Amino acid sequence: AYGESANVFGAP
């Protein structure tokens, strides 16, 4: 979900 830990894209 949005606002969880950093993902593969590097977004928050």
Curated annotation (Swiss-Prot):
<keyword id="KW-0934">Plastid</keyword>
<keyword id="KW-0472">Membrane</keyword>
<keyword id="KW-0604">Photosystem II</keyword>
<dbReference type="GO" id="GO:0015979">
    <property type="term" value="P:photosynthesis"/>
</dbReference>
<comment type="function">
    <text>May be involved in the regulation of photosystem II.</text>
</comment>
<keyword id="KW-0602">Photosynthesis</keyword>
<keyword id="KW-0150">Chloroplast</keyword>
<keyword id="KW-0793">Thylakoid</keyword>
<dbReference type="GO" id="GO:0009523">
    <property type="term" value="C:photosystem II"/>
</dbReference>
<protein>
    <recommendedName>
        <fullName>Oxygen-evolving enhancer protein 2</fullName>
    </recommendedName>
</protein>
<comment type="similarity">
    <text>Belongs to the PsbP family.</text>
</comment>
<dbReference type="GO" id="GO:0009535">
    <property type="term" value="C:chloroplast thylakoid membrane"/>
</dbReference>
